[in-house]
Amino acid sequence: MVEHYPVLHREVLSFFKNIKGRYIVDATVGGGGHSFLLLKNLPETFLIGIDKDDYALEKAEEKLSPFKGRFRLIKGSFKDIDTIVHSMDIKYVSGVLFDLGVSTFQLKTERGFSFQREEPLDMRMDRTQKKTAFDVVNRYTKIELEKIIKDYGEEKFARRIASAIVEARKKKRIETTKELAQIVYNVYPPPLRRGRIHPATKTFQAIRIEVNNELEEIKEGVNKGIDLLEKGGIIAVISFHSLEDRIVKNIYRERKRLKDIEILTKKPITPGTEEIRENPPSRSAKLRVAKRI
């Protein structure tokens, strides 16, 4: 079986390898891919892993078992990163990592993140929260749907897609990923249906962001992550679409103006050809890194 490394793993390690302090926070621990490599390569490190997703935490616990006693996994949102770290009687940390992508295993969990299979419209990272993709698709007004698809998906056919969703749900509730993907597919002009990226990709992204309140949480989490860093500490954020990247870029720019950080990546680092070939979903990843001063 081929071992799949987490996205931009070499680049992430290169920034964290000279960290002097003890504590690193993986604010989006997922299945534990980045955490595993950090623990393996930084033997003095104690890692705090945060995730909303119970299933992710189970996978991470299993993955990180060789490093028993050197990590702690906590269920929570990275917007509460400060509260979580302080609850462990830790004031400052040496490194913070955010990987904002949806984990590969989440795409395979039959929770509606993917339109490759017939799945219920769910998309919740935290299974205990009430709002699901089903609620967004079946209860939001046409204007609300158009706004989120346009703003969060940067989808040029947002108005047509919103109208098609509202028309379709008049006949019956839209219950599965395949149903929603087909509605979006049918809206697209035929010449644009055959591209490398499925027509429904941006709409699914938009609905997932809405369900999980992702953009607000990124703003809050990244700012708090910077505040937690000791002098010389490193923050690294991997984003997967322009909305996320813009938020991170603007936060870094503002915190640099306030003389809180030095930006270490003048332009975001992106995967090389080899990594994209081995792991196609990594193609849109962008890594931005800064150091606390």
Swiss-Prot record:
<feature type="binding site">
    <location>
        <position position="51"/>
    </location>
    <ligand>
        <name>S-adenosyl-L-methionine</name>
    </ligand>
</feature>
<keyword id="KW-0698">rRNA processing</keyword>
<feature type="region of interest" description="Disordered">
    <location>
        <begin position="271"/>
        <end position="293"/>
    </location>
</feature>
<protein>
    <recommendedName>
        <fullName>Ribosomal RNA small subunit methyltransferase H</fullName>
        <ecNumber>2.1.1.199</ecNumber>
    </recommendedName>
</protein>
<keyword id="KW-0949">S-adenosyl-L-methionine</keyword>
<dbReference type="GO" id="GO:0070475">
    <property type="term" value="P:rRNA base methylation"/>
</dbReference>
<feature type="binding site">
    <location>
        <position position="99"/>
    </location>
    <ligand>
        <name>S-adenosyl-L-methionine</name>
    </ligand>
</feature>
<feature type="binding site">
    <location>
        <position position="78"/>
    </location>
    <ligand>
        <name>S-adenosyl-L-methionine</name>
    </ligand>
</feature>
<dbReference type="Pfam" id="PF01795">
    <property type="entry name" value="Methyltransf_5"/>
</dbReference>
<keyword id="KW-0963">Cytoplasm</keyword>
<dbReference type="GO" id="GO:0005737">
    <property type="term" value="C:cytoplasm"/>
</dbReference>
<keyword id="KW-0489">Methyltransferase</keyword>
<comment type="function">
    <text>Specifically methylates the N4 position of cytidine in position 1402 (C1402) of 16S rRNA.</text>
</comment>
<feature type="binding site">
    <location>
        <begin position="32"/>
        <end position="34"/>
    </location>
    <ligand>
        <name>S-adenosyl-L-methionine</name>
    </ligand>
</feature>
<dbReference type="InterPro" id="IPR023397">
    <property type="entry name" value="SAM-dep_MeTrfase_MraW_recog"/>
</dbReference>
<dbReference type="InterPro" id="IPR002903">
    <property type="entry name" value="RsmH"/>
</dbReference>
<dbReference type="InterPro" id="IPR029063">
    <property type="entry name" value="SAM-dependent_MTases_sf"/>
</dbReference>
<comment type="similarity">
    <text>Belongs to the methyltransferase superfamily. RsmH family.</text>
</comment>
<dbReference type="GO" id="GO:0071424">
    <property type="term" value="F:rRNA (cytosine-N4-)-methyltransferase activity"/>
</dbReference>
<keyword id="KW-0808">Transferase</keyword>
<feature type="binding site">
    <location>
        <position position="106"/>
    </location>
    <ligand>
        <name>S-adenosyl-L-methionine</name>
    </ligand>
</feature>
